[in-house]
Amino acid sequence: QAARMPVFPAGDSERNATLTHLSGALTWIFGPLIVHSSTRPGSLLRREAAKAFNYQLIAGGVFVAAAIVFGILGLGNLMGLVWLGWLGLTIAGAVKAGNGQDWTNPLTKFTKVTPLDPSGR
């Protein structure tokens, strides 16, 4: 039987990057922004904080747009699907960061909106 790779390696940077992505679920853009502002330029944690911030900002816009469109069309019940998509991509970003993978969120790729430089500068 092959050895299992841990979902979250023991490194502090990866663990903190994971928590930074997950902080977006509780603090929206503010948790990732605080982490980004308080870390060294070029560090893994700063890069992941920028990615988390950018995604949460875009997702906030998607929530507002979806609420307006679904409200006009009388499809407010579909907001639950938008929320599930947001939660899934937030968790995916956290897992990828925890595994040390340089992953770009599909929503960020699609919109190309990056107010914070994802290279960590």
Predicted features by range, described:
Residues 40-62, 95-107:
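Amphipathic, cytosolic membrane-interfacial segments at TM-TM junctions
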Residues 1-7:
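N-terminal leader/transit sequences and adjacent low-complexity N-terminal tails
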Residues 14-41, 68-88, 108-118:
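Hydrophobic, aromatic-rich membrane-embedded alpha-helical segments
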Residues 81-102:
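Hydrophobic alpha-helical transmembrane segments and immediately flanking/interface helices
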Residues 8-19, 53:
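Short, Lys/Arg-rich cytosolic juxtamembrane segment immediately N-terminal
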